């Protein structure tokens, strides 16, 4: 049997090699969705943000072959695939844009954004953030920097310098500037790039709080907007044009940051991010509430209509946004992810008996704005969510060893308290892994029934099919790295939705 299996394997590999030769000789350089065949020839690549790979470097971007789970060519025994031309310091997060054959890596060590070409497996450009270092994501559940999916605009928040950075990379009007906004720390941009929301650290906002009726610096959520030429002329030397918090450059403003009003049934309580409905008609702001020092965890809906957008311009254009309603999420809300009209919300609820928080996943029916169910998940700050194969939702958290589950385990209970949860959306069943450190990255390798994670600074691999005892770990011995693995992304995913934080 062993000999027959070996001969069969050799035959399969040989056939695959012949096919590759035929494809190459015929000049075909695409593998699916019209994407270019990359220089490495690897079709299932996982990008790793690696900090301090050696004593002589503070950052690297290696990538693995997720089909074979190796970091080098399948017909070699050593070496490592890597993104060429990368010089960023301490890469922290990866914004995965496989539909554009690229990605953006934020480097916290120098405050830059590296634009990576997946097609060429090299850095195509580096964007300097004019306002300096943007807010980091670890261990917080938000992100402070975002590249629009059309690769045209970069928005970044810097709570230390109290500014928002705007970089317009489009050829018709390139510009880089900062807008003054105290304590701005989170950025969420819709897939179409027409709405760019900014969140204020530790902020609240009551209902019936309207632009022009209140101090423009006293809101909890803002919107970055590019002005039309007529508006630019009208806003000259008026940083508070139409109730804006700031407009820059002041002599002839091009960009403004406008407050988001609240209606009679809407409010904000420590908002941390927003997710957008699949049809693009609404933003759902995640209010962290008690987990972030506030009172009530909830979702706040903001309708996105033609009348609320600034017609005749590009980039952020949410000039007249008004929040309309709140959906209470009693079990906590720090992150959320849509699957059709169902919104999965991760967060923690305070437990008075222990004085600690414990993790929950709340399922929301958005057409009815009602909670359909709540289920236990890992404790900690839930900063990563992504859908995988076999009806699975994967959730990563930081500081999961500071919650109720860890306390119970220390007292002798047989309770897993790891930072990665696999949730089966068909059976509504949670599987929590063993503790390996903070869960800082997840890449769903769709089509192959596995996910890659970065936990405690190392790379791990899991099957999307559980066993009777829980999550199944796969062999990671050929993908581990010397430095600190802080994030990961599936470069060859089918869509830009294979992201975890953006």
Where are the regions a protein language model picked out?
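Bacterial N-terminal signal peptides that target proteins for export
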Residues: 2-13
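Hydrophobic membrane-insertion alpha-helices, especially the h-region
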Residues: 16-18
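Predominantly soluble domains enriched in secretory-pathway, periplasmic, or organellar proteins
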Residues: 26-502
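C-terminal motif of bacterial Sec signal peptides marking the signal peptidase cleavage site
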Residues: 21-25
């Amino acid at each position: 049997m062993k000999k027959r299996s070996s001969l069969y394997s050799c035959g399969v590999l040989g056939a695959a090699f012949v096919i590759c030769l035929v494809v190459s000789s015929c000049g075909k350089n695409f593998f699916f969705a019209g994407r270019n065949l990359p220089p490495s020839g690897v079709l299932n690549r996982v990008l790793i943000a690696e900090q301090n790979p050696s004593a002589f470097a503070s950052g690297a971007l290696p990538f693995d072959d997720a089909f074979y789970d190796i970091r080098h060519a399948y017909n070699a025994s050593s070496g490592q695939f890597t993104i060429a031309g990368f010089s960023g310091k301490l890469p922290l997060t990866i914004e995965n844009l496989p539909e554009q054959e690229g990605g953006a890596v934020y480097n916290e060590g120098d405050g830059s954004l590296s634009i990576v070409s997946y097609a060429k497996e090299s850095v195509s450009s580096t964007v300097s953030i004019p306002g300096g270092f943007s807010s980091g994501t670890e261990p917080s559940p938000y992100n402070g920097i975002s590249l629009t999916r059309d690769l045209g605009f970069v928005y970044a928040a810097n709570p230390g310098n109290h500014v928002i950075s705007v970089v317009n990379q489009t050829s018709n009007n390139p510009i880089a500037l900062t807008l003054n906004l105290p304590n701005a720390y989170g950025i969420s941009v819709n897939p179409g790039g027409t709405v760019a929301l900014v969140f204020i650290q530790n902020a609240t906002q009551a209902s019936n709080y309207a632009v022009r009726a209140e101090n423009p610096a006293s809101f909890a959520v803002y919107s970055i907007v590019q002005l039309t030429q007529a508006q630019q002329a009208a806003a000259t030397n008026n940083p508070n044009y139409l109730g804006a918090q700031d407009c820059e450059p002041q002599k002839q403003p091009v960009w403004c940051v406008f407050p988001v009003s609240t209606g009679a049934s809407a409010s904000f309580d420590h908002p941390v991010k927003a997710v957008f409905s699949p049809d693009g008609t609404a933003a759902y702001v995640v209010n962290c509430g008690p987990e972030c020092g506030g009172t009530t965890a909830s979702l706040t809906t903001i309708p996105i209509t033609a009348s609320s957008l600034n017609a005749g311009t590009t980039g952020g254009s949410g000039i007249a946004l008004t929040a309309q309603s709140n959906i209470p999420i009693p079990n906590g809300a720090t992150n959320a992810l849509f699957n059709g009209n169902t919104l999965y919300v991760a967060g923690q609820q305070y437990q008075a008996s222990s004085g600690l928080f414990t993790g929950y996943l709340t399922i929301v029916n958005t057409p009815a704005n009602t909670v359909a169910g709540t289920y236990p998940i890992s404790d900690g700050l839930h900063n990563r969510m992504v859908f995988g194969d076999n009806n699975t939702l994967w959730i990563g958290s930081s500081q999961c060893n500071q919650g109720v589950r860890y306390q119970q385990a220390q007292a002798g209970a047989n309770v897993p308290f790891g930072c990665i949860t696999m949730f089966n959306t068909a059976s509504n069943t949670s599987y929590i892994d063993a503790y390996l450190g903070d869960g800082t990255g997840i890449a769903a390798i769709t089509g192959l029934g596995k996910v890659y994670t970065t936990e405690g600074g190392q790379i791990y691999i899991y099957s999307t099919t559980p066993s009777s005892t829980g999550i199944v770990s796969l062999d990671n011995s050929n993908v581990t790295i010397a430095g600190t693995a802080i994030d990961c992304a599936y470069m060859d995913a089918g869509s830009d939705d294979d992201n975890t934080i953006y």
